[in-house]
Amino acid sequence: MGRSNDFEVRQGSINTANARVRLADYVARRIAEHGVRHVFMLTGGGAMHLNDALGRAEGLHYVCCHHEQAAAMAAESYARLSGRMAAVNVTTGPGGINALNGVHGAYTDSIPMIVLSGQVKRETLRHNATVLVRQLGDQEADITDMVKSITKFAVTVSSPLDIRYLLEKALWLAESGRPGPVWLDIPIDIQSSLIEPARLRGFDPVAEGYGHEYAIPGEYGWLTGAALDRAAQDVVSAIREARRPVLMPGTGIRIAGVYEPFLELADKLGIAVAPAWNAQDLVPDNHPLYVGRPGTVGDRSGNFAVQCSDLLLVLGCRLNIRQISYNYAGFAPDAKKIMVDVDAPELFKPTISIDIPIHADLRTFVPAMIKALDGYEAPSAHRTYIDWAMERRRRYPAVLPEYWQTQGVVNPYCFTERLFEALEPDEVIVMADATAAVVTVQAAKLKKGQRLYSNSGAASMGYDLPATIGAWHAMPPTAKRVICLAGDGSIMQNFQELQTIIGQGIPAKIFLYNNSGYHSIRQTQQAYFDGHSVGCGPDSGVTFPDFGKVAQAFGFAYTRTSEHEDMVRAIADTLAAPGAAICEMFIDKGQNFAPKVSSRRLEDGSMVTAPLHDLAPFLPRDELIEAMRVPE
């Protein structure tokens, strides 16, 4: 992703242009110069000049989706996989509004994105009217007010003379500090106006008080230079003194572009590694330091390792509720918690209590840690704790022997285990939320180089197909396929993008978990409302099509399985099929997510949540006590 130094070089290149150009062409050229290569769009009259310019610009490839939500989700997935920001182009009114869900997902998960929306001409903007009206222009919507809480920067361009300044500011903010989406809303008469780029004022982050490449004005205690080195040395000293330290890396590792240095750091530290939710692909299952996946729907070994630790080093993970549960007071209760984050408020939010908050960027902190580890020798107690945690990994697998006894339907945990046995290293696997994500994160045995992700913060249904599209366009030309794990409920939310996959010739292998509805809410209703179901399947108002006929209609190869004995055949046929293919698995509706954190309702109606080490189905108390007995 482009940063400050690259930005200054690109900024200089545009100043040589003296000819008058259409503003829309200027925007397209500038984002291409900044490093944007793909634009995900749905055309519309309010954005017609932007559509035309983005379709003409050298160095830009436009990808047409059938819904603006899908375009935004595809752009998010593209940036997540490639490390390169994408653009989204939508029209005014409903076009912009439709994109909000995907933009929100990028905001929560810290993914850079620039949205370029069309808008009605300036004279018909409602805020220019002499009286207060709901709408003045045709299809007008005051989109920037709607998106300000889910973007880092959102503005309606009011003068052609401001375009360079606003565009440069938007691009800088999207990738600086904690990345996220930005939004430029451009009225149609401004899109078509002629400008002289050399006469336009630019954006200077230092002159505006941003101070340095990453920090936002007023942020707490930003560490650089000697202060950062001292902090790294202090962390190393604390780890050396600990007996049961755990390293919890999050998605911030890849966002910061320090994946390879992180692996070096982990090896030098030699302590247990328990990746956070959605960062499970940072280390393969056979990594010698990997002890499990902690979280509310993680595994027992990962949660035992974290809950019994005496030091927890959190790098690039914001410790959200899905990670630490609603019983956040009971999270890693005996651990000294050290957290490094680029976004200062995350260090001080009310759901966590951090002993050593470090406000720094992982781009500089990880190298500082590696430097501080020169000559370091890990205490023998650290290896003892890793061995202890590894033994619990072996003792408490996610896929239990009794799951294989299922008849007439497929157990999703068993299917996922078989699928990942068949997948190759370096595969890219995108997930929907709910069953497709929860079961996969628990049961998948990842190989070196595999990428596995969903959107975690928004966790919206409908992410699977758009994410597949975005991932494919981020993959190298040598890629032969992209794997999509979808749910029957989720896939319906952006059903139309099946045609986008077929139309663009994307060799997507879609594994469709069919549990006759919304299994996550079904489990909730069964647990808290005596089995009374509302809106979670065919028996409570939500119906689904025959997906075999759907596959045929769109032109997908199709296979199905409802027996364990047939799973390997179905997986092999799908992976070997030329082009796009769907494998539908009819899975056991009686299989709940397990293990998982459980809550119970008290007599006064309030809820109480069990701690992370005490997952449902609950272990016998004596077994739990023994499992948590740590080495001296």
Indicate where each model-derived feature is located:
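Thiamine diphosphate
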Residues: 116, 124-138, 296, 350, ...
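Active-site metal-binding loops of divalent metal-dependent hydrolases
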Residues: 251-252, 317-318, 434, 487-489, ...
